[in-house]
C-alpha cells in the first residue's frame, strides 16, 4: 500500500556507472555538489568514498547530529543487549551487543542550518550539508582546536554512520543515497526516521502520528519520497498534547506513534498507550547497526566494554564541517 500524502509518486531513481566517468541518472536531480564530487576524481570526497572498504572491521560507529539526539543514541548503543552475540537471535545474552566497539559522537554545534528548510535556498543548503556531514564523519581528519588548524588529532574512520537529524533525512538523504550508490556503498549510513518508518506494520488504513515539535512540512517532505510506507500520516504532535490527560492519541484514534522527540522516553509512551505500536529511534538504530555489522562482518570481536569519544562539528567560512576534539572524549 502507498501512503496517502499526495497524489504524486515519483519514480525511483536509476543510477549507473558509465565507463570511466561515473555519473548519476535520475528522475530527481541531485545537487550540484554531488555531481561535482562524482566527476572530480582528485577531490578528497571522491577519494574517500572510492577507497571505502565495506568489509574492513577497523573504524568506529559514528553518530552525527544535534547534541540531545547524539547523546541519546550513543547511550542506547552503549547499553544495547538485544541480540545473542553468537547467532544474532533477538534475545539478551548478558553480553553487550557492541562490546569492543568505539562509538564516536559528532555533535553539530550550530543547528540553525538544520531548521532552514522552509525556503528553497535553505533546503538546498541543507541537502549539501547532509552530504558534507556524512563525509566528515566517515573521514579520519580532525583537529585538536579550531584556532590551531596545524594541530591534527587522531580520528578513526567511520565504518557505520547514523545521521540523527530528521531534517537531513527529509531533504538530504536522497542526495547522499545517490552518491553512495555510485560508489557501491551499502549498509553504512542510517537515518532514525527512515528506520522507524520502515517498521510500521499495517496498511494504508493504519493511522500514524509523530511525536515531535518540528514542523509537519518536514515529515511530509520525507514521506513524499517513501512510496512503500504502509500507513497514513495523520499528524505531528508535540509531547505536551500527546501526554495530556485527554491525549490526541485517543481522540485521533492513532495506531502507531513514531517518537522523534528525544526528550520523551519510549517506555513512558508504551505504558500510557499499551495498545499502540510505539517506534523509538534508539531501538531501531541499535538493530540496524547490529545487523549491518554482522552482514558486513565488521565487528572487532574484542572482549571489552564499548568505549566512546567525542567531536564537535563546526562549519567554517567555506561551509565545510571541521571536526575538533570535544571535552567529553
Enumerate the language-model features and the residues they cover.
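Bacterial N-terminal signal peptides that target proteins for export
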Residues: 1-8
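Residues embedded in well-ordered secondary-structure elements
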Residues: 8-9, 52
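Bacterial N-terminal signal peptides
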Residues: 9-16
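Non-catalytic structural scaffold of enzyme domains
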Residues: 20-329
Amino acid at each position: 500500500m502507498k501512503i496517502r500524502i499526495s497524489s504524486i509518486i515519483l519514480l525511483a531513481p536509476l543510477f549507473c556507472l558509465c565507463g570511466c566517468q561515473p555519473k548519476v541518472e535520475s528522475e530527481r536531480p541531485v545537487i550540484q555538489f554531488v555531481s561535482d564530487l562524482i566527476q572530480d576524481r582528485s577531490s578528497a570526497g571522491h577519494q574517500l568514498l572510492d577507497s571505502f572498504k565495506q568489509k574492513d572491521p577497523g573504524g568506529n560507529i559514528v553518530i552525527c547530529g544535534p547534541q540531545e539526539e547524539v547523546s541519546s543514541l550513543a547511550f542506547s548503543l552503549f547499553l544495547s543487549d538485544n541480540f545473542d552475540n553468537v547467532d544474532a537471535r533477538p534475545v539478551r545474552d548478558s553480553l553487550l551487543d557492541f562490546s569492543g566497539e568505539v562509538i564516536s559522537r559528532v555533535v553539530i554545534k550550530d543547528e540553525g542550518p538544520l531548521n532552514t528548510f522552509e525556503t528553497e535556498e535553505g533546503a538546498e543548503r541543507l541537502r549539501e550539508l547532509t552530504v558534507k556531514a556524512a563525509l566528515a564523519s566517515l573521514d579520519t581528519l580532525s583537529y585538536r582546536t579550531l584556532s590551531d588548524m596545524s594541530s591534527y588529532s587522531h580520528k578513526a574512520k567511520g565504518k557505520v554512520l547514523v545521521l540523527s537529524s530528521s531534517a537531513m533525512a527529509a531533504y538530504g538523504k536522497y542526495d547522499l543515497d545517490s552518491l553512495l550508490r555510485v560508489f557501491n556503498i551499502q549498509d553504512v549510513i542510517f537515518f532514525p526516521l527512515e528506520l522507524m518508518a520502515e517498521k510500521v506494520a499495517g496498511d494504508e488504513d493504519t493511522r500514524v502520528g509523530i511525536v515531535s515539535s518540528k514542523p509537519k512540512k518536514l515529515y511530509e517532505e520525507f514521506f513524499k519520497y517513501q512510496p512503500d510506507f504502509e500507513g497514513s500520516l495523520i499528524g505531528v504532535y508535540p509531547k505536551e498534547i500527546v501526554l495530556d490527560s485527554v491525549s490526541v492519541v485517543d481522540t485521533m484514534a492513532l495506531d502507531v506513534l513514531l517518537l522523534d522527540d528525544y526528550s520523551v522516553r519510549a517506555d513512558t509512551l508504551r505504558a500510557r498507550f499499551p495498545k499502540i505500536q510505539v517506534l523509538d529511534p534508539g531501538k531501531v538504530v541499535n538493530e540496524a547497526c547490529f545487523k549491518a555489522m554482522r552482514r558486513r562482518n565488521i565487528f572487532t570481536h574484542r572482549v571489552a566494554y564499548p568505549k566512546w569519544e567525542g567531536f564537535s562539528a563546526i562549519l567554517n567560512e567555506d561551509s565545510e564541517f571541521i571536526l575538533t576534539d570535544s571535552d567529553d572524549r
